[in-house]
Amino acid sequence: MTGREHGIPARAVLRTVIGCERESYRVQTTNASLSTDMVREFVIAGHGNLEKVRKMLEENPELLNGSYAWSETDYETAIQGAAQVGSVPVAEYLLEKGAPLEICAAAMLGQKDEVERRIRDNPDNINSKGAHGIPLLPHAAWSGDLELVQYLFRNGANAGSSSALHNAVTRGYYDLVVWLVENASPDLNSKNFQGKTPLSVAIERKQETIAHLLREHGANE
């Protein structure tokens, strides 16, 4: 999932951004050498295409923190794209190149100590959202770190439990799926951006134990 078209003029900007966190701020500067299409292409590549990210960044280092505007309020950088789809290789590469570590990316990477530190420093960070308004909990679910997910949920990051379930099922994290189903009240029949339910994904990926668990709790394909 790479964002949504809203029928408004798209914009490509470079910004200093801690966009996922509550204390977010923006410094936007238009860069004449970067076209809107180029920034959009780079951000889309950030959703898991490491080879393309490497190539584009080597040719245009200014793309690193380039942000594409899907709408007037929905900006996305390549590392935010990597964080929302759970692409560890892309996120780690962009961090190595100097991209800012946002709390959503830290959660996706399973950096529990870093996430906890940021929430201690600013409790409002528990309500952080990434690109497209995706909450913190689904990002953390990509990591498979049950303790991290439990910590976030206990401290108020309970939005996005259905998306978190989808991510856990996609990765085959059985223990995390069990915990989410029993504690986080996800919609077991919610559909992802491909129109698939968690049970459909489990069956498609031949995750029989997860599929059995979901059926026991009333999930449908």
State where each predicted segment sits.
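TPR-adjacent "capping" and linker segments in tetratricopeptide-repeat scaffold/adaptor proteins
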Residues: 25-33, 94-98
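Leucine-rich solenoid repeat scaffolds
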Residues: 79-86, 91, 95, 194-221
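Ankyrin repeat domain, specifically the short helix-to-loop turn at the C-terminus of the second helix
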Residues: 57-63, 92-99, 119-125, 150-158, ...
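Ankyrin-repeat boundary/"N-cap" motif
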Residues: 32-44, 65-81, 100-107, 128-138, ...
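Ankyrin repeat A-helix N-terminal signature
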Residues: 44-49, 77, 81-87, 105-111, ...
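Ankyrin-repeat and related helical/solenoid repeat scaffolds used for protein-protein interactions
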Residues: 162-205
